[in-house]
């Protein structure tokens, strides 16, 4: 596992965007051989999306031959609701880059057959071979996507009941009213994430410090879903300074020295 310790959310977003752009450009995708990118929603990736849009506008990257799969979607929220993840992705990213509509894959939280929708999503991912890079965030309780504590580390795309803590955390997007936050969501599984060629998780703020500590210094534990990254051959965590407050001094020093060349010029 790599840990990239930075100072601010802006630096985290910029580092993540540069990493994605390098991966896409090194892959040199074509129509017949697209780069497959997994994407998250929420507040954490916003700086990364801003930086990706800037790099696209500067001619540094094209998304014409990139295929995307999003991590999750609320169940029962209309697609055009401002807080649906469909709306979020178009508003904050897709509308600003050159990705073709047919290359965008989002879970349908209003599908008449939820189980069939989850199977369809998994099958479509498999049809592309694998996701080359999956970017994600993490919840205060260590959840990745909506894989809440005690999720199976072998799980696939499915419906999940959201914990009260997750709904409270997300209520800030719903006018502070937890009752407006859907109780269920569709989410890729932990196993789906671990199948990706590379997983990059962004961690911001002191409220994520326990989750980061569990990911880096704790044991693999289904109560801290983020700890599954220890099982992945190519995992990278990009974090800001407040999120590192629970790490041991020697742990942080180790990764800071190890990544010194990779965190310059931000």
UniProtKB/Swiss-Prot annotation:
InterPro entries tied to this protein: Glc/Gal-6P_isomerase (IPR006148), Glucosamine6P_isomerase (IPR004547), Glucosamine6P_isomerase_CS (IPR018321), NagB/RpiA_transferase-like (IPR037171)
Organism: Cronobacter sakazakii (strain ATCC BAA-894) (Enterobacter sakazakii)
Annotated keywords: Allosteric enzyme, Carbohydrate metabolism, Hydrolase
Family indicated by similarity: Belongs to the glucosamine/galactosamine-6-phosphate isomerase family. NagB subfamily.
Catalytic activity of the protein: alpha-D-glucosamine 6-phosphate + H2O = beta-D-fructose 6-phosphate + NH4(+)
Coiled coil: none
Single GO biological process annotation from the record: carbohydrate metabolic process
GO molecular function, one term: identical protein binding
PANTHER family on file: GLUCOSAMINE-6-PHOSPHATE ISOMERASE
Notes on how activity is controlled: Allosterically activated by N-acetylglucosamine 6-phosphate (GlcNAc6P).
Associated pathway: Amino-sugar metabolism; N-acetylneuraminate degradation; D-fructose 6-phosphate from N-acetylneuraminate: step 5/5
Active site: 72, 141, 143, 148
Assembly mode: Homohexamer.
Site (Part of the allosteric site) location in chain: 151, 158, 160-161, 254
Entry annotated with the keyword Hydrolase: yes
Protein name: Glucosamine-6-phosphate deaminase
Pfam families xrefs: Glucosamine_iso
Example of a GO cellular component annotation carried by this entry: cytoplasm
Physiological role: Catalyzes the reversible isomerization-deamination of glucosamine 6-phosphate (GlcN6P) to form fructose 6-phosphate (Fru6P) and ammonium ion.
EC number: 3.5.99.6
Matching SUPFAM superfamilies: NagB/RpiA/CoA transferase-like (SSF100950)
């Amino acid at each position: 596992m790599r840990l990239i310790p930075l100072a601010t959310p802006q630096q985290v977003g910029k580092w993540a965007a540069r990493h994605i752009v390098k991966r896409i450009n090194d892959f040199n995708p074509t129509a017949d051989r697209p780069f497959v990118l997994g994407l998250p929603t929420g507040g954490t990736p916003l700086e990364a999306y801003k930086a990706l849009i800037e790099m696209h506008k500067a001619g540094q990257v094209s998304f014409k031959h990139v295929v995307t799969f999003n991590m999750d979607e609320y169940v029962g929220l209309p697609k055009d609701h401002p807080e649906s993840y469909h709306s979020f992705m178009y508003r904050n990213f897709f509308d600003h880059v050159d990705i073709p509509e047919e290359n965008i894959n989002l879970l349908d939280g209003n599908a008449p057959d939820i189980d069939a929708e989850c199977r369809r999503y998994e099958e479509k991912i498999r049809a592309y071979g694998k996701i080359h890079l999956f970017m994600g965030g993490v919840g205060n309780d260590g959840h990745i996507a909506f894989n809440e504590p005690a999720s199976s580390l072998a799980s696939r795309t499915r419906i999940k009941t959201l914990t009260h803590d997750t709904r409270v955390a997300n209520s800030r997007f719903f006018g502070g009213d937890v009752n407006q936050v859907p109780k269920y969501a569709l989410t890729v599984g932990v196993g789906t994430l671990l199948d990706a060629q590379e997983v990059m998780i962004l961690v911001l703020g002191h409220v994520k410090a326990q989750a980061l500590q569990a990911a880096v210094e704790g044991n693999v534990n289904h109560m801290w879903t983020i700890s599954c990254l220890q099982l992945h051959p190519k995992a990278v965590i990009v974090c800001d300074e407040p999120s590192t407050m629970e790490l041991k001094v020697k742990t942080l020093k180790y990764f800071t020295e190890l990544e010194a060349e990779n965190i310059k010029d931000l």
